[in-house]
């Protein structure tokens, strides 16, 4: 993902000062769904709410940024209505639903094609009768975002439907659709025929247990790369192990290493530049920042802090701060060098448990 570009000053005498000033201006823009009818637009550098995006329906929840980074697709809390937000105007430009009459259709997962002309939806259908509801699905549907019509119903890969945890993703060029199951199955994005398979259900190397990788790219991962924690079982000692893996999905490559026995870590955030990362240790009454040296392939520190029951983690665009958030109406700001709490940023409303979209760069219109 791109970083905020630095301004090159023409005057040589101001070069050092200019470089320092440019670094100080590094920021990112957060789009935070809330338990209201707004998505809050928050600027990292000023730590201020700079705008609000008024949705057509209450409680925006699940969000997804498109490949061009100029639209957010927003699923409201009931899962029945998808709204499309134009980030240039910060306004809702479209919406659709599959519900009609006594039939409610809830979207449990979705992936939008990079062209923004179609999406893949995982849905369930609930039909209200006189004395009962009839539940059907889950189904995988191709939906034309321009014609607002279902254009195809896909067979589940391997013939196994998944009530929970179905995950699809398009490649950046839109030619391949990845389905994440026991294996990673690559489908032609137009014909939906299988063209490749990464058999993660089998050990990557002899004597290793099956790995469980995170395949979701972080804010500061390189394009086409996802770095995250993974867990696997040592088949000889029969113990769970924890490690870090860097996965290049298109090349079916995973560079991984173990750190030690599995621990209750949640959240994993790579810092800008890709040399450091952080995670959160969370046990009853015990919370810690874990600091990782990705270049040295090691954990370099555990730092206790007050913590909170539900936590997400994000690194600032300049790498100097750590943000702890999720649930409630606050973001706790920590120094990434000392791990001391600097301050708590408060909002007028609670944020939902849906994902926050973070885009490096200043908020512009």
Question: What are the roles of these predicted feature ranges?
Answer:
Residues 38-40, 80-84, 129-141, 183-189, ...:
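Structural motif
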Residues 48-54, 91-100, 149-159, 193-208, ...:
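A short beta-strand motif characteristic of beta-propeller blades
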Residues 58-66, 103-112, 161-170, 204-221, ...:
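Repeated scaffold domains used in trafficking and secretory/extracellular systems
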């Amino acid at each position: 993902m791109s970083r905020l570009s630095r301004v090159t000053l023409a005057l040589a005498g101001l070069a050092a000062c200019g470089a320092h000033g440019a670094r100080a201006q590094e920021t990112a823009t957060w789009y935070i769904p809330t338990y209201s009818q707004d998505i809050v637009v928050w600027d990292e550098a000023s730590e201020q709410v700079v705008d609000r995006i008024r949705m057509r329906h209450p409680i925006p929840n699940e969000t997804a940024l498109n490949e061009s980074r100029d639209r957010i697709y927003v699923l409201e809390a009931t899962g029945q209505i998808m709204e499309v937000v134009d980030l240039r105007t910060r306004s809702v430009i479209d919406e659709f639903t599959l519900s009609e009459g006594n039939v409610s259709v809830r979207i449990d997962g979705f992936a939008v094609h990079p062209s923004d002309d179609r999406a893949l939806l995982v849905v369930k259908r609930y039909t209200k009768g006189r004395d009962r509801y009839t539940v059907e699905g889950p189904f995988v549907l191709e939906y034309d975002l321009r014609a607002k019509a279902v254009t195809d119903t896909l067979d589940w890969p391997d013939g196994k439907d998944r009530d929970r945890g179905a995950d699809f993703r398009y490649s950046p060029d839109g030619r391949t659709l990845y389905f994440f199951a026991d294996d990673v199955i690559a489908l032609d994005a137009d014909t939906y025929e299988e063209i490749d398979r990464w058999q993660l259900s089998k050990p990557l190397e002899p004597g290793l247990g099956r790995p469980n990788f995170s395949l979701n790219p972080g804010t500061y991962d390189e394009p086409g790369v996802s770095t995250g924690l993974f867990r696997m079982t040592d088949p000889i000692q029969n113990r769970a192990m924890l490690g870090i893996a860097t996965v290049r999905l298109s090349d079916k490559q995973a560079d991984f290493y173990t750190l030690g026995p599995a621990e209750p870590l949640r959240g994993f955030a790579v810092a800008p530049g890709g040399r450091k990362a952080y995670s959160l240790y969370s046990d009853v009454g015990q919370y810690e920042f874990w600091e990782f040296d990705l270049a040295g392939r090691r954990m370099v520190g555990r730092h206790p802090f007050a913590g909170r029951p539900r936590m997400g983690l994000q690194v600032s665009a300049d790498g100097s701060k750590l943000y702890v958030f999720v649930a409630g109406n606050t973001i706790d700001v920590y120094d990434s060098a000392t791990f001391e709490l600097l301050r708590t940023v408060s909002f007028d409303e609670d944020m939902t448990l849906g994902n926050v979209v973070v885009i490096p760069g200043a908020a512009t219109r």
